[in-house]
Amino acid sequence: MFLKILEPCDFSRGRFRIENFIESSKYAQNLFKIQNEIIQNVKDESLAENVPIITDEVLNYMIFTAKNIKAGNILEIGTATGYSGLFLARVANENGGFLTTMEIDEKRYGKAVENFKKLGLFEKNRMILGDALEEIPRLDKGIKYDFIFIHASKGQYLKFFEMSYELLNENGIIFIDNLMFRGLVAVKKEEIPKRYKTIVKRLKEFIEKLNEEYNFVLLPFGDGVGIVKK
């Protein structure tokens, strides 16, 4: 482990007011500019249809990280409509590699394929329709990945992680989004709605496992970002 879970700001001493934190998040989001009309449309349509996509500040940091490690082959678990994948595919292609992205929902997969084709990225990358738990074992074991992005079914995060970690290059990074699950992972047990107790319990156990056994850091922005370096 190179870093432990980051300590929150000390709001009680007035060093950093909660409203300032919210404004800081908005400011960070606004720094991320989409300079492509097609990608902007993908984002707008996804939000309009309530498709969960990565937030701007998390996406900005993820792409910054992938670029800085010069990620070639990239694996994405959870394509959705292809929004984050469009950015990752361009990073992979620029570094001489390709993106492999998986989506279980047929409708979203079809939309993602359409979006990739609009940007000329479909033929350069690999898009898979299917359950990642079944598709990951079918991947070529001879191909290793520099960067892996997990943002699919949270109840399966541990399985996704363990399966994909075996495919990660040395010094490669696994980037895991939405670890805090609407912030519920951080609240007291009695404050968690009954319908979310199981998923929150699983996420807490997953985070604790990563923190104890892997080179891991949890970043408290977006809805919680976990990073593991091999």
Descriptions of predicted regions:
Residues M1-F147, K154-F175, L179-K230:
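A short alpha-helical cap/connector motif
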